[in-house]
């Protein structure tokens, strides 16, 4: 859980209360508009947990693959140990799609054949909803493996993903679409179960169980924490509001809100005007989301990568050890 901030603080003042993970929480999902600092917050969270001896996987769902740049290390399609207790992973969607298609070839052959549609494996990755299904499957495997204490999800920008909940004007990211995808897939699976043999039925049931497992993980605040990152500007604030409302309408609780790139000291008139505008948006967010943990991060004034992540981790979570419950 992120530290709570009740007022805008000068950059030099540290917030003392450390992060609190309650019970067996395993998944920290970081969401928000593109360009607000999700990847930096994801990476800094991984730094903080791994520094406390917790095996952590930072898992990028962003096609831009910013984690490589932020950690200043080349990452690939397999988890890579980048420092003690911290692994990072940037899966290649095309490669994962080929593997996923091979894994469930019988299901997809039956499904596409039912509608007399021929789909080549190389075209599979571009189909709506496939990337979410692949990530769901991959996350399920990670949870079953139980190798890591925490999995940090650096999500794709909400405006870059195709919603599966009939919400064309609101893109809500992986969490919401997994929940909606479940209902669509159950209808298709029920249809397939009437016309195919035991081997396909078993594969269908396996996929259904995985969808149910990840749904239960996302709905349980003891196993998942959703953090929304935003900046104090109109477009970002409005998209964050829609994201939170849509996700929570499906039973997934957003526990924390990070307000990034906040100007805290300025001399020029332009900066003072911008700071006044930011203050207005910050106060609105604090008023609207009083029940959530709200953290304010300063504008660091330079690119955050490598060793600078330690400062962000401290600003997010403090210097202390993890609280116990």
What are these regions (language model features)?
Residues 144, 166, 179, 212-215, ...:
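Signal for well-folded cores of large energy- and translation-related assemblies
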Residues 16-36, 40-165, 169-205:
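Nucleotide-state-sensitive switch-loop elements of NTP-binding domains
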Residues 200-214, 236:
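C-terminal-of-GTPase-core extension/linker across diverse P-loop GTPases
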Residues 2-22, 215-325:
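C-terminal lobe/tail of nucleotide-utilizing enzymes
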Residues 133-137, 141, 209-212, 238, ...:
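Short, contiguous clusters of charged residues that form electrostatic/catalytic patches at enzyme active sites
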Residues 135, 167, 181, 210, ...:
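Alpha-helical structural motif
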Residues 11, 45, 49, 56, ...:
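Residue-identity detector for threonine
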Residues 108-112, 116, 209, 213-216, ...:
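N-proximal short alpha-helices
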């Amino acid at each position: 859980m992120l530290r709570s901030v009740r007022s805008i603080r000068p950059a030099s003042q540290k917030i003392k209360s450390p992060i609190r993970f309650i019970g067996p929480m395993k998944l920290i999902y970081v969401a928000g508009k593109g360009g607000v600092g999700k990847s930096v917050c994801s990476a800094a969270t991984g730094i903080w947990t791994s520094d406390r001896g917790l095996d952590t996987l930072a898992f990028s769902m962003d096609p831009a693959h910013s984690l490589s740049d932020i950690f200043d290390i080349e990452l690939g399609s397999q988890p890579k140990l980048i420092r003690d207790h911290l692994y990072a992973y940037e899966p290649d969607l095309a490669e994962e799609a080929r593997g996923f298609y091979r894994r469930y070839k019988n299901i997809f052959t039956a499904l596409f054949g039912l509608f007399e549609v021929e789909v080549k494996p190389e075209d599979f990755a571009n189909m709506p909803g496939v990337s979410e299904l692949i990530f769901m499957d991959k996350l399920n495997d990670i949870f079953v493996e139980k190798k890591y204490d925490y999995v940090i999800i650096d999500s794709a920008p909400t405006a870059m993903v195709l919603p599966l909940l009939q919400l064309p004007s609101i893109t809500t990211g992986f969490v919401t679409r997994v929940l909606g995808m479940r209902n669509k897939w159950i209808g298709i699976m029920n249809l397939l179960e009437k016309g195919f043999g035991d081997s396909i039925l078993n594969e269908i049931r396996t996929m259904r169980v995985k969808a149910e497992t990840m749904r239960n993980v996302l709905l349980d605040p003891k196993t998942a924490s959703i953090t929304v990152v935003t900046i104090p500007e109109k477009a970002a604030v409005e998209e964050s509001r829609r994201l939170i409302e849509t996700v929570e309408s499906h039973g997934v609780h957003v526990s924390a809100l990070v307000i990034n790139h906040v100007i805290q000291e300025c001399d020029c008139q332009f900066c003072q005007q911008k700071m006044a505008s930011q203050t207005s948006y910050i106060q609105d967010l604090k008023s609207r989301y009083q029940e959530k943990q709200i953290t304010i991060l300063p504008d660091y004034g330079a690119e955050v990568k490598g060793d600078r992540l330690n400062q962000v981790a401290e600003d997010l979570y403090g210097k202390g050890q993890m609280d116990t419950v």
